Amino acid sequence: MIRELFEKEGFTLDEEQERKFSIYLQELLRWNKVHNLTSIKKPEEIVRRHFIDSVSVVRCFERIGLDLRGKHFADVGSGAGFPGVPLKIYLKDIKLTLIESVSKKCSFLEYLKIKLNEDYRVLCTRAEKVEEKFDVVLARALGEFEEVKEILEKLSIGYVFVYKGSKLKEEWLKDYKLCELSLSFMPKSYILWKKV
């Protein structure tokens, strides 16, 4: 089911990626029963609205010609790992730091790292307290854009990408460029990006 849903959106998974996404899905469903990590409960919807939506930014990377080799990514407000962990599974060779301030979510991310045998780092703190700089900073479902963009830009020495779903305000385009995507389950999806 996972591979087919990805392929429907134009993303190809190898067996290892499919296996890791399957483990991720199982663990998310299991942990979600106790810890309420996501409001989306149906497996197919988790694959679409969390895994595929997270990976969709790859199309933006391709459009702007972003060379990902050796890049250090930061996922700010990672929650249950979105978009960082799906991107790590899909892109494989990126260096990834997940920044999350809620301890139960940090525990899940650390546990998931072991289950997936992935190499990423979890910083269990508020983004404002992080002094480190990253090549690519990502944020998805992180509150009001106007309130978080300064924090995201402070963390970046390269690019900032902000997933906005189907919501778009004209004033956001003063400082940020627009990457418009179309997925079967979300005909209009916007990702704002900026080279810092």
Curated annotation (Swiss-Prot):
One of its GO terms (molecular function) is rRNA (guanine-N7-)-methyltransferase activity. Transmembrane segments: none annotated. It is an enzyme of class 2 (transferase). InterPro entries: rRNA_ssu_MeTfrase_G (IPR003682), SAM-dependent_MTases_sf (IPR029063). It is found in: Cytoplasm. It comes from Aquifex aeolicus (strain VF5). The lineage of its organism: Bacteria, Pseudomonadati, Aquificota, Aquificia, Aquificales. The keyword DNA-binding does not apply. One of its GO terms (cellular component) is cytosol. NCBIfam families: rsmG_gidB. This is Ribosomal RNA small subunit methyltransferase G. S-adenosyl-L-methionine binds at G77, F82, A127, E128, R140.
